[in-house]
Amino acid sequence: MSINGGMTEQMIVPESCLIELDSRVPVQDACLVEPLAVAIHGFVKTKTKNHHRIAVIGGGTIGICTIAAARYLGCKVDLYAKYDHQIEAGLKLGAGELNGQYDRVIDCVGNDDTLKLSVNHCKPGSWLVLLGIPLKGINLPGLKTIMNEIKVLPSIMYSSTDGVKDFEIAAKVLAKFPNIGKTIITHRFSLEESEEAFRVAADKTSESIKVIFDPNIS
């Protein structure tokens, strides 16, 4: 994230940075390993197990990837999303409707409204994981957070834990659910269509989730 060159045609990286991709996964969908790793990191840090009930707040790329990661772990997961097309994507990956309190609430938005909603759906002693970036500061309902001893994890994208990289687990998620790309990647463009691709990605009315450049499109 801190090194220039992400838009270059070629990049040299250390071999240790490479992750093997299952042959069932379309190469053009391999870009989903990155947002999946963001989701995995939050679950790894909170030691999430298959008996934990998960709520995902936000139906963008990270939110929908978090649903996939939760399903990979064997968890029951529900989604709160703003737009109908995001709710539909969540349903396709097995998410239900937000209801009650949860062992893990994953806020993939990070604004005041979603943080308040997230705290309201946290069980006493549960984890609130911040995958969305609160650009204007973190404003949590103080009394409820303290009285219920809600643990808050600000997550720094991804890393490795006990020698296992989040990217490696993310690649396994993609291998188990190779059709994730059809759900999350809503728009594909050639490199020549870059201006339109960025326009669609920024347009809230385009019903986009993940917009990518696909080298197979000419």
What are these regions (language model features)?
Residues 1-18:
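Glycine-rich phosphate/adenylate-binding loop and adjacent beta-alpha elements
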Residues 46, 53, 87-151:
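Glycine-rich cofactor phosphate-binding loops and adjacent beta1-alpha1 units
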Residues 10, 31, 55, 59, ...:
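Glycine- and other small-residue-rich loops at beta-strand/loop junctions that grip anionic moieties
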Residues 138-186, 195-196:
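C-terminal substrate-binding/catalytic core of Rossmann-like NAD(P)-dependent dehydrogenases/reductases
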Residues 56, 72, 129, 133-136, ...:
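C-terminal capping/lid region of NAD(P)-dependent oxidoreductase domains
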Residues 8, 18, 39, 102, ...:
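A general structural signal for well-ordered alpha-helical segments in protein cores
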Residues 17-27, 100, 151:
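Glycine/charged-rich beta-loop-alpha catalytic/anionic-binding loops adjacent to active sites
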Residues 26-99:
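Mid-domain Rossmann-like dinucleotide-binding core that forms the NAD(H)/NADP(H) cofactor-binding site
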